Amino acid sequence: SVEIKIVGLDSASNDNSTYRVDMRNHANPTSFLQELEKGMQAVNPDVVITKKGDSIDFPAMMSIASSANIGLRLGRDGRNVVLRRKSITNWSYGRLVKSEAYHALQGRLHIDLGHSFIGKEGGIEGLIEISRISGIPVQDLSRLSPGSAISAIQINQSMNDGVLVPWKKNRAEDIKTGLEMVISDRGGLYLDPLPGVHRDVFELDFASLFPSIIATRNISPETMKCECCKPIISGHSNNVKFPLDPKEAEHLAMSRALSNDNMGLMVPEIGTYSCSLKYGFLPRVVAPIISRRRELKSRMKRKGDEWDKRQNVLKWLLVTCFGYTGYRNARFGRIECHEAICAWSREILLDAKGLAEEDGWRCIHAIVDSIWLVDNEGRTSEEQRSSIRSLMSKIEYNSGIRIELEDFYKWIAFIPNKKSGIPSLTKYFAHGEKGWKIRGIEIRQHSTCNWIRKMQTDMLKNLQFGPPEKIIGQTIGIFFESVSNLTKGEVPLMDLVISRRVRKRPEEYRVSNLTLAALLRGKLLGQEDLLGRKTHFVVVNRSRREPVDRIKLRSEINPNCSSSAINRDGIEFYKALALRASLSILSPFGITEDILL
């Protein structure tokens, strides 16, 4: 069935008109489409929001209309749906991605939130926010990446400056010696976390660190090693930092030019500099976005409200702007900018760590723009918070970049590597004043089945009720109970559906794995090519000789079926998944695989 419902962005709107069209009430598909057209005319929406409409709904309706030799008139004034672009598959950063077809409604906006990255991150509010900044129509923007939006903003800035827009990047990387390459070709700073569980932890985060470095250190393709400034003399330091306000930054550059202070801004470690006399192109692009995001964050009342959605999509714009400085095809990119930004980020984080240690704090972990601190002097809770506030002021003054208290955690657990025992850099979970912060474990992975996700959720909920070390036994019991339910056939089969991204066609696979089995079964059942998408299936019998018999696709599963439909090999497969997921939670507390087996 299809439901056409008016959903106003204004919370005060009382218009909740709904028009439902159920295909089961129609003798043939043609009458269903005709009824749907009547519904669209009756409700007459300006914006049509679908979930996977470009990949499922509109292709199906257009196929029905084509078979019946009629039009699909869902636009205004009885105009047909327009296929502006067919689906395409391409490689992006080593990952095969499918861009779905683009179905446009004449006179209306069709936004497919199921396939829109910006829509998923910021909803309609986020799409409107970026559309205003970039000048890209909302309907087009919903099918583009943040990179396309930042490119549009850069082009607009270039046109406002009266500067020709490069057709494509035409500048090669500067020649470097082997030693210079080793020193400069590095990313942000990572410090290995101290293993185990830590209590009373403060996490400090720099706000928009990389974009703020671009703005405050005047990093842009035309400002790196400029001819108007002098290289840094050995032993001389230049601590000039440009303000985030573009007008104030322009004024600072002009005053330095008038005073003939033409010493470049030294980049740490790599021996290069940026201009101090002319405010750069990239800083003028990112500074207004940083200011706008700061304003939106100040309006936030709760996580997930409209202001949070808007600031969240601006975060992705800023992240992309940094990434584009090192992207080989970016019109306004230059790898030396990327290297300088990373060098500054390492210096700023190390300086923050040094200031923290001077104030009696111990750094237990640091990642690029975040640092985790525990008290090293036995201070009271109030003394700790006072010290943290003072420390944040020092760091902000020293760096010229705002730093924020992300959260205060009652405890945080870093997950050790299964083989080496060394804690992983990006796998941890913590419980603080703002709730849970979880990174890297199965509950955060798209491929995880609902059964595993529920088990980990229950384990984490149990840990928050008391000191984790004292209730770890109850948490272990959740693992055994989940496995018991599986073996007794009490787990719904739909909760065991796992996902795999399809990166190759069936004939390109060299190993007969579960993804290949799912593709072969889909081909046997006449399903469409899933290249670049995800396939969803349940493992029922891994020992079967024919790959197509080892799994069942999600579309084949009866909602009433349970894990009793899985044979012993399938049960063992899911038990192994449960064991690994449980160890992600329990291993920081000293629980090993031997205890759970």
Indicate where each model-derived feature is located.
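Alpha-helical packing segments of well-folded alpha/beta enzyme cores
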Residues: 32-39, 289, 345-348, 352
